Amino acid sequence: FISKMGYPKQTQVQVLPESGETPLFKQFFKNWRDKEATDGMGVAYVPNHIAKIENVPFDVTVLHESPAMAAQHGMVDDGSGKKQIWRIENCEKVPVLESHYGQFYGGDSYIILYHYKSGGKQGQIIYTWQGDDSTKDEITASAILSAQLDEELGGGPVQVRVVQGKEPAHLISLFGGKPMIIYKGGTSREGGQTKDANVRLFQVRTSSSGFSRAVEVDNTASNLNSNDAFVLTTPSASYLWVGQGSTNVEKNGAKELLKILGVSASEIPEGQETDDFWGALGGKADYRTSARLKDKLNAHPPRLFACSNKTGRFIIEEVPGEISQDDLATDDVMLLDTWDQVYVWVGNEAQEDEKKEAIASAYKYIESDPANRDKRTPVAITKQGFEPPTFIGWFLGWEADYWDVDPLERAMAGLSS
């Protein structure tokens, strides 16, 4: 259905049991009524009477409860269990060499079978990782082959579909302390390996599980971030750039990445860059420089909320998992809470009412926080395409030209490829 409708490949699917519908789900039904529901102070609901949808103020205090986020970052174990990885080629599973475990190419799709123990019982997880540049046939085949593998194992495994850039913490932890490496595109299939670019930039960041992920990003200085470590490779030299707020885990992850890439690098602490370093990135540029201590980041991780009134009521829903640029809906207003500041991001197609409600809700959100937030916490408004480095820095692998192509065209292009 997602493919046929031309929706983005990363569209999330949520399964709801009967009588377990969420408020967000119910908003899309004009005449939804729960069993024994009443209007007002006990007035019985009349089935043939449909009330007019009114703009009801949203209770922002409920946003401070975050069970979805806790579930998203759950760890069944420490990632040291047995694993098998296959790459999808010609609609078949092809085993990946163990020496290449942990390396994922954006032009491929993979199936990862993981075995774990819980409460003395054996369990399995099937991760289906789908690259941004993977073809429609590969994506379809990965889903079918994952279902077949599940059947072969008796239907017991947990199946997890993973879109590039939305890797859960447990998946990142599976590679023996080495970083999970995600190449921007290309493929690793036999006889069809993509030639590496002359200049490459990798961003190394720690996940909530304490393991690192190395993501290839555009090789521009604006993608640097004081909170992370970076690896920059060129034909003449390579560099390990250490941000002031980066951790030892990230620094060590960058060193492991250098070993895998087969290059040696000069270590450059932030603030001690050479002209050659800046030259390889096309010159200096603004980037996120306000280093934030990692313990503070762990205590107050960034949270993203989508604001919409498309159903006739203004609602706000938290985006689960690690945030990515894909989560910013151009027809909505988004709230990004970085603790020290709350950003109101305005999509180009957002409605005027959404903008007004979102700004007001940002202030109410701060005031109602049970953690006793400083009421003076600044609220910044930024528009799509004009995001400052202080906003961009929270998103891993930000692409400056992401919205140059219409989302529907991008989705259709992915399907036709």
Curated annotation (Swiss-Prot):
Q: Quick check: keyword Glycosyltransferase in the entry?
A: no
Which CDD domains does this UniProt record tie to the protein?
gelsolin_S4_like, gelsolin_S5_like, gelsolin_S6_like
Question: Keywords of this protein's UniProt record, alphabetized?
Answer: Actin capping, Actin-binding, Calcium, Cilium biogenesis/degradation, Cytoplasm, Cytoskeleton, Metal-binding, Repeat
Q: Does the keyword Metal-binding apply?
A: yes
Q: Cite the binding residues for Ca(2+) 8.
A: 331-332, 354
Question: Binding positions for Ca(2+) 7?
Answer: 227-228, 250
GO MF terms listed in the record are: actin filament binding; metal ion binding; phosphatidylinositol-4,5-bisphosphate binding
Gene3D superfamilies (alphabetical): Severin
Question: Can you tell me which residues bind Ca(2+) 6?
Answer: 150, 155, 157
Where in or outside the cell it occurs: the entry states: Cytoplasm, Cytoskeleton
Gelsolin-like repeat segments run 93-171, 213-261, 316-392
GO terms for biological process? actin filament severing; actin polymerization or depolymerization; barbed-end actin filament capping; cell projection assembly; central nervous system development; cilium assembly
Q: Which Pfam families match?
A: Gelsolin
* Entry binding sites for Ca(2+) 5: 107-108, 138, 187
User: Where the protein is mainly located, per its record?
Assistant: cytoplasm
- List the GO terms this entry assigns under cellular component, sorted alphabetically: actin cytoskeleton; cytoplasm; extracellular space
Q: Which family does it belong to?
A: Belongs to the villin/gelsolin family.
Q: What is known of its domains?
A: Comprises six structurally related gelsolin-like (G1-G6) domains, that, in a calcium-free environment, are packed together to form a compact globular structure in which the putative actin-binding sequences are not sufficiently exposed to enable binding to occur. Binding calcium may release the connections that join the N- and C-terminal halves of gelsolin, enabling each half to bind actin relatively independently. G1 and G4 bind two Ca(2+) in a type I and in a type II manner. G2, G3, G5 and G6 bind only one Ca(2+) in a type II manner.
Q: Name the job this protein performs.
A: Calcium-regulated, actin-modulating protein that binds to the plus (or barbed) ends of actin monomers or filaments, preventing monomer exchange (end-blocking or capping). It can promote the assembly of monomers into filaments (nucleation) as well as sever filaments already formed. Plays a role in ciliogenesis.
Specify the protein name: Gelsolin
Q: Which organism is it from?
A: Xenopus laevis
